[in-house]
């Protein structure tokens, strides 16, 4: 009796280009966050991504090109994430608290990205992207305080400097977050919130 023919095993489909690039960016982000740009070698990045050297070079011909792509990956959609987090906050609470809660939520959800962003950037182009990122965040904050100025609940001078003040405080929180200093982070968040809400006396919309 003839044995039934075995069905050929289905080959696992190769990841599509978009999926492969996202995978490389995600793994390279972790590598840059852990080692920094200078210490991370091209071999480290290839090994971490587990793709062939040829494929890796095809997508990213240099470490600099890869870093720029990872940096874009980190900051693209950042303000949109803040807007989404802000929309989930209680509209009846202080505007400063709402802004802080949105930023803290993003810090907590994307610590690896912040670890990389705190590393020294390798060139002027990267510095320019980080500068633009900071300006976008300041613009987001200013937009949340503008209605308070219009309603006479916040003077325009305070509203103008408040985004920079909040950003400076957030930088301190960010540093402690990437160090996983949870107790210190919790205390710092509460103290920042209490201090700024006291300065901006009536920050409810």
Regions found by a protein language model. Give the residues of each.
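Helix-turn-helix
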Residues: 2, 23, 31-65, 69
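Amphipathic alpha-helical packing segments from all-alpha helical-bundle domains
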Residues: 76-79, 109, 126-151, 160-164, ...
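Amphipathic alpha-helical segments used for helix-helix packing
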Residues: 107-128, 175-179
